């Protein structure tokens, strides 16, 4: 039995106190949640401390909370911040555990079957298990997740019911415990003791839970009774302390008992017979043979091992769901009365909507050509409507809320004041005629003041032409486009901040990590060309890039005033007015944000006599040197992950993948 602790409150620890309009935003959000409001929007301008406000709300409403971000990097940053704010509570991280993932697919035009290929990140897998076990054991839980949280995960009831509960004095034989551990997918390994394994030494069983990476547990028997349970260091075996209750959750999220497994296999066999009959009636003998061979192999593995590669494709039968019924996801592990916060909701909600369609198109091809049973289509992400059905209370957080969020609620809480007193930038609209000369003059003014400039264009060609022109004029300039890899992008931003060059040109400079306090000018070319990057939301996001500097200024080059431009200008002016009034009333002098410049990733290069640290020329390396570089990077990636620097770890991961592709 799981003893769930539901009385521990969230305890926020911070050297800051709410300032600006944070107190009003926190109070309004909390009052609305306690008053039963289902949905509300926190409209927070860039740099106003939205994460701190979210933390204050969580600590006051005291509900288990799911925070969803639109990518792993952002989720990692939020996870680190929440860990600092809530050191005594369970802050968990739940994202896709694949470092590399090539989904199973079939291309009929070339008769090419692509086997599923993936590389699982052991650290993230541990964190996922930690998240689900925390949700079943306690109430003071914050899970920071990417949209992976809407993908199928296995039944929380089966997961909880399969848990092995142990206490000192409990009557259970050693062999019974070993059988129970095997049933929940733990492996016996007396030599290489790692997560998801157990080892046996006489009357002592040591178990390494899937949710830990340093500490394991030692269960000591006296006859058919547990004498003592100790927490131990997994590496040295040193005892940390005794525990009076140990719950061991399954080593995989897809788990089922023997009786249920036989029922599931019977359903899989019935579906197989039905699909084979259909293929044979249509004369698709190759597809029928393929499906029979693959499915019968999987059934044999399930029967003998309780697991098979691609077991998730049979999740509908394992969970006992009807065709078309939504899969179990992380959301089902939460209690009914939980809170959802959607960070950067204008991006994240679009992702939640789009996940289902892309997944179904690929899987339908596998079903049509006999690679999978039709039930594989039910191993899928949630549809948006299904996601909505899980929502008890939700807060959308964004500087520019999308149409979807606005359609869900009329309750909008604004957070416009920055703790630094910084104002939204002033905006000029200038004609496109003569824009190059005008822009060059503005750039030179910034260079003279040791400030930087962002220029955003609409096309790759224009960005390239503008880069060439400014170089001819003696400006130190770089162009950042979509082909540039993650690590190189980080290096470019660092060089911009250090003053290696003064101007950065790009098409979409809204990506995370592009907040540069040294940028005092943002120039928007073709501002009057309506579209994704020139709509109201896109313009406000771009304008926000200049909001980190006290001299922040935006120039829109356009021949006409579009509705989007006018709305973006009006909204920025409205916010600026509020900020000026607040600063005046409280005697605040705006200050440019101070932000440390992180060093570029470098690895050790070994020569015959010495080791020097320098940036590597990977292209000219031999295969052996690249292998050494990969090993060094993997070590640094693990160190970064242990320090909770997931942004750095993700950059390392991307570089490792690039190096592997060179071979």
Swiss-Prot record:
Keywords: ATP-binding, Cytoplasm, DNA damage, DNA excision, DNA repair, Excision nuclease, Nucleotide-binding, SOS response
Keyword Cell inner membrane: no
Motif position, Beta-hairpin: 97-120
SMART domains: DEXDc, HELICc
UVR domain: residues covered: 627-662
Disulfides per UniProt: none
PROSITE patterns in the cross-refs: HELICASE_ATP_BIND_1, HELICASE_CTER, UVR
Cellular compartments annotated: Cytoplasm
Annotated Pfam families: Helicase_C (PF00271), ResIII (PF04851), UVR (PF02151), UvrB (PF12344), UvrB_inter (PF17757)
Annotated Helicase ATP-binding domain residues: 31-418
Binding residues for ATP: 44-51
GO biological process terms, semicolon-separated: nucleotide-excision repair; SOS response
CDD domains, A to Z: DEXHc_UvrB (cd17916), SF2_C_UvrB (cd18790)
Family: Belongs to the UvrB family.
Quaternary structure, from the entry: Forms a heterotetramer with UvrA during the search for lesions. Interacts with UvrC in an incision complex.
Domain statement: The beta-hairpin motif is involved in DNA binding.
Protein name: UvrABC system protein B
Lineage of the organism: Bacteria, Bacillati, Bacillota, Bacilli, Lactobacillales
């Amino acid at each position: 039995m799981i003893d769930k602790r539901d009385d521990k409150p969230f305890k926020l620890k911070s050297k800051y106190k709410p300032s600006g309009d944070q107190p009003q935003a926190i109070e309004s959000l909390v009052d609305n949640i306690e008053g039963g409001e289902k949905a509300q929007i926190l409209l927070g301008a860039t740099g106003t401390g939205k994460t701190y406000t979210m933390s204050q709300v969580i600590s006051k409403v005291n509900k288990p909370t799911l925070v969803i971000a639109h990518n792993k990097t952002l989720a990692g940053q939020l996870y680190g911040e929440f860990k600092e704010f809530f050191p005594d509570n369970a802050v968990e991280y739940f994202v896709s555990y694949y470092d590399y993932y090539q989904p199973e697919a079939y291309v009929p035009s070339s008769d090419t079957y692509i086997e599923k290929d993936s590389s699982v990140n052991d650290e993230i897998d541990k964190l996922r298990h930690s998240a689900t076990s925390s949700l079943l054991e306690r109430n003071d839980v914050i899970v920071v997740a990417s949209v992976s949280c809407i993908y199928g995960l296995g039944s929380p009831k089966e997961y909880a019911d399969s848990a092995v509960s142990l206490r000192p004095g409990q009557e259970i034989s050693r062999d019974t415990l070993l059988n129970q551990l095997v049933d929940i997918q733990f492996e016996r390994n007396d030599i290489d003791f790692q997560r998801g394994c157990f080892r046996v030494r006489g009357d002592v069983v040591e178990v390494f839970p899937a949710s830990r990476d340093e500490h394991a547990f030692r269960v000591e028997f006296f006859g058919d009774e547990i004498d003592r349970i100790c927490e131990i260091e997994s590496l040295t075996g040193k005892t940390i302390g005794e525990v009076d209750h140990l719950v061991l959750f399954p080593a995989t999220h897809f788990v089922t008992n023997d009786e249920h497994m036989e029922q599931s296999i019977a359903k899989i066999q019935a579906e197989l017979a039905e699909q084979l009959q259909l293929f044979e009636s249509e004369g698709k003998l190759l597809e029928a043979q393929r499906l029979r061979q693959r499915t019968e192999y999987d059934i044999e593995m399930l029967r003998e091992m309780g697991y098979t590669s691609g077991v998730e494709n049979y999740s509908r039968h394992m969970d006992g769901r009807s065709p078309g019924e939504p899969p179990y996801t992380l959301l089902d592990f939460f209690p009914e009365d939980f809170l959802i916060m959607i960070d950067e909701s204008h991006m994240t909600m679009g992702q939640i909507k789009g996940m289902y369609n892309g997944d179904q198109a690929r899987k339908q091809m596998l079903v049509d050509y006999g690679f999978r049973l039709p039930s594989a289509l039910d191993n899928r992400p949630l549809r948006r409507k299904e996601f909505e059905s899980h929502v008890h209370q939700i807060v959308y957080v964004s500087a520019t809320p999308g149409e979807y969020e606005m359609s869900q609620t009329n309750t909008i809480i604004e957070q416009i004041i920055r703790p630094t007193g910084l104002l939204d930038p002033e905006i000029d609209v200038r004609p496109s005629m003569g824009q190059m000369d005008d822009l060059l003059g503005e750039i030179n003014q910034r260079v003279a003041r040791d400030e930087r400039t962002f220029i955003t264009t609409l096309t790759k060609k224009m960005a390239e032409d503008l880069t060439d022109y400014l170089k001819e004029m003696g400006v130190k300039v770089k162009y950042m486009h979509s082909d540039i890899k993650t690590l190189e992008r980080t290096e470019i931003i660092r060089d911009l901040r250090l003053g290696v060059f003064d101007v950065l040109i790009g098409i979409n400079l809204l990506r995370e990590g592009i907040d540069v306090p040294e940028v005092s000018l943002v120039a928007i070319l073709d501002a009057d060309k309506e579209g994704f990057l020139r709509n109201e939301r896109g313009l406000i996001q771009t304008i926000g890039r200049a909001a980190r500097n006290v001299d922040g200024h935006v120039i829109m080059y356009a021949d006409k005033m579009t509705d989007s431009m006018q709305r973006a200008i009006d909204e920025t002016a409205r916010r600026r007015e509020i900020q000026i009034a607040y600063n005046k009333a409280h005697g605040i002098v705006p200050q440019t944000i101070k932000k440390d410049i992180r060093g570029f990733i470098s690895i050790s290069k070994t020569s015959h006599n010495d080791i020097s640290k320098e940036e590597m020329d990977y292209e000219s390396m031999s295969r052996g040197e690249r292998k050494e570089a990969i090993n060094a990077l993997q070590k640094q990636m693990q160190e970064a992950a242990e320090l909770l620097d997931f942004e750095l770890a993700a950059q390392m991961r991307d570089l490792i993948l690039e190096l592997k592709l060179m071979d």
